[in-house]
């Protein structure tokens, strides 16, 4: 009985001191890809409206869930989750895609400067317009950003499929998540590769967003080119099922 314990002790003593301390300080190991939390931990609920409800307004199921939370363990909220009224998941995703080298502070600063530049340009246009034209000018940079991305989203894409030793570009309908990703990728690529040397990123990005908002610009042209290629390869559409 003592032999296995002695062999285990010798293996542990052979490790370096730092490795032994790191192993001993590991949290409880689970079977789900070394998760930090055990299966009994619950996901956090980040919703101010839920916590503002009075107990008398809760349903029986919500009251039971509230009693369970008093004795259950709750996971820590992720650093990217927030209950702020200014939180926007689409802008957050765009900021992450624009980030380089993990410098998220710089990416957030560029995004804030871009939205500010969009608003300034629209207000200059608003003040110079007549009373009739002012009603048609959008000044909210968040609405302009979302509408510009929607205008850049392609409906149909091309997927390479191998048939007979050759790759064919087969047109397929794109999911919403893929459409949004391509629109963001094209916008960021256009601003990085075709930006004048002395032009700052917020200035270029704000210009491209306003162009896309009015269905103009190189990003819109790139979307139309993809649609034309999909239309030209419509004879290969049946390769999706064969």
UniProtKB/Swiss-Prot annotation:
GO BP terms, alphabetized: mitochondrial translation; ribosomal small subunit assembly; translation
UniProt cross-references to Pfam families, sorted A to Z: Ribosomal_S7
Recorded coiled-coil stretches: none
InterPro entries, per database record: Ribosomal_uS7, Ribosomal_uS7_dom, Ribosomal_uS7_dom_sf
CDD domains: uS7_Mitochondria_Mammalian
Cell compartment(s), UniProt: Mitochondrion
A GO term, aspect molecular function: structural constituent of ribosome
Keywords: Acetylation, Mitochondrion, Ribonucleoprotein, Ribosomal protein, Transit peptide
Transit peptide residues according to the UniProt entry: 1-37
Organism domain of life: Eukaryota
Similarity annotation: Belongs to the universal ribosomal protein uS7 family.
Assembly with partners or alone: Component of the mitochondrial ribosome small subunit (28S) which comprises a 12S rRNA and about 30 distinct proteins.
Record's protein name: Small ribosomal subunit protein uS7m
Protein's organism: Rattus norvegicus
């Amino acid at each position: 009985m003592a032999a296995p314990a002695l062999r285990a002790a010798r293996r542990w003593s052979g490790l370096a001191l730092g490795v032994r301390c790191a192993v001993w300080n590991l949290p409880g190991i689970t079977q789900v890809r070394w998760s930090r939390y055990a299966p009994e931990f619950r996901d956090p609920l980040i919703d101010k409206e839920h916590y503002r409800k009075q107990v008398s307004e809760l349903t029986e199921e919500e009251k039971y869930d509230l009693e369970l939370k008093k004795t259950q363990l709750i996971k820590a909220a992720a650093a990217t989750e927030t209950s702020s009224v200014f939180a926007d998941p689409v802008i957050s995703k765009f900021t992450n895609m624009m980030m380089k080298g993990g410098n998220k502070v710089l990416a957030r600063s560029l995004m804030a400067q871009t939205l500010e530049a969009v608003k300034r340009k629209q207000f200059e246009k608003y003040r110079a317009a007549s009373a009739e034209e002012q009603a048609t000018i959008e000044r909210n940079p968040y609405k302009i950003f979302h509408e510009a991305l929607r205008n850049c989203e392609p409906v149909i894409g091309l997927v390479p499929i191998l048939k007979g030793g050759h790759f064919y570009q087969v047109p397929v309908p794109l999911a919403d998540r893929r459409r949004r990703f391509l629109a963001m990728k094209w916008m960021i690529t256009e601003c990085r590769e075709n930006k004048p040397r002395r032009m700052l990123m917020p200035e270029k990005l704000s210009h491209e967003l306003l162009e896309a908002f009015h269905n103009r610009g190189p990003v819109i042209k790139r979307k139309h080119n993809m649609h034309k290629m999909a239309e030209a390869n419509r004879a290969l559409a049946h390769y999706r099922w064969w």
